[in-house]
């Protein structure tokens, strides 16, 4: 499209701020982002700047759970209460002090996904023949006389490509070292996810989370149909080749999702599949943890700490 043929740049790349009006999602602010290439997705301002529903060329890619969008005021922090506000979406963020199994003082997947962003802004600019937009915000996970962590997020795209770039910088603003755990919960569901969907991953050493995952290893490469066994499977992939980036592809034969992440700071890839009637989802999860919870990581000597004033940079790229 010739730039001289349009009166408003929103025709090419649009960012609109909206607010949910009813139910448990009432009051949640979001940015709805669309581009000429066919991307259409929501950035959930009040849920750690995660990505909610995501469509490509009008077709839904992301998973939508039973709860839908839930305001963080309803967050239940203990045990598995996180699941009561997990609406799915394309990207949920887990951490910053806890990822995985609940343990003393820490519920499933930590607090960050239920923390609203602040210092919010967006901008749009031309760089040559490309119109770019960037949305940014910062989440603070803090406690008086406790942790004082932030996660500063930038989400970027242009008008011509079906690509999204995310850059996060975590920082410890406190005066003592802080446990630091981070996971990106990238969720795909129907109608994109269908039986026979291929999952192409880096060559890895595979660690099974339990006997069910060990007994269904083939499901990690080819997603089956729902099962009366009500399978809930989790694998951890440790890429054999060390590099600054790794790439995974999910291909249903018609559409593809390509995920590239900074494997120097996210060295493990979790893979979760829920294969139950009316519960059908695939999640790929770049992380710096083993998904066993903070207590397990501490006992195993693998718990990562952020020193005072230390920063931790991670990046993701999604291509469709």
Give residue spans per PLM region.
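C-terminal beta-strand-rich structural cap/linker in extracellular carbohydrate-active enzymes
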Residues: 229-233
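Surface-exposed acidic/polar loop and edge beta-strand patches at domain peripheries
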Residues: 1-165, 176-179, 188-225, 237-320
């Amino acid at each position: 499209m010739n730039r001289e043929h349009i009166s408003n740049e929103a025709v090419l790349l649009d960012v609109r701020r909206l607010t949910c009006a009813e139910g448990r999602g009432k009051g949640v602010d979001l940015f709805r982002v669309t581009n000429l290439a066919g991307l259409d997705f929501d950035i959930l301002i009040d849920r750690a700047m995660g990505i909610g529903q995501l469509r490509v060329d009008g077709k839904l890619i992301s998973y939508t759970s039973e709860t839908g969008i839930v305001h963080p005021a309803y967050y239940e922090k203990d045990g598995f209460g996180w699941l009561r506000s997990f609406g799915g979406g394309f990207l949920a963020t887990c951490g910053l002090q806890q990822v995985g199994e609940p343990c003393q003082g820490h519920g499933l997947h930590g607090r960050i996904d239920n923390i609203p962003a602040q210092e919010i802004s967006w901008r749009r600019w031309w760089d040559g023949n490309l119109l770019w937009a960037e949305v940014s915000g910062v989440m603070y996970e803090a406690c008086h006389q406790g942790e004082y962590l932030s996660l500063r997020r930038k989400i970027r795209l242009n008008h011509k490509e079906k690509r999204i770039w995310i850059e996060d910088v975590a920082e410890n603003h406190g005066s003592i070292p802080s446990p630091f755990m981070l996971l990106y919960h990238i969720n795909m569901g129907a109608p994109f996810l269908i039986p026979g969907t291929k999952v192409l991953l880096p060559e890895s050493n595979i660690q099974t989370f339990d006997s069910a995952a060990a007994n269904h290893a083939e499901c990690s490469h080819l997603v089956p149909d729902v099962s009366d066994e009500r399978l809930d499977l989790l694998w951890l992939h440790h890429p054999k080749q060390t590099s600054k980036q790794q790439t995974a592809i999910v291909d249903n034969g018609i559409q593809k999702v390509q995920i590239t992440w900074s494997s120097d700071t996210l060295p493990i890839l979790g893979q979760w599949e829920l294969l139950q009637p009316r519960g059908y989802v695939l999640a790929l999860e770049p992380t710096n943890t083993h998904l066993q919870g903070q207590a397990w990581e501490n006992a195993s000597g693998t718990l990562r700490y952020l020193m005072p004033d230390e920063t931790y940079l991670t990046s993701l790229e999604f291509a469709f």
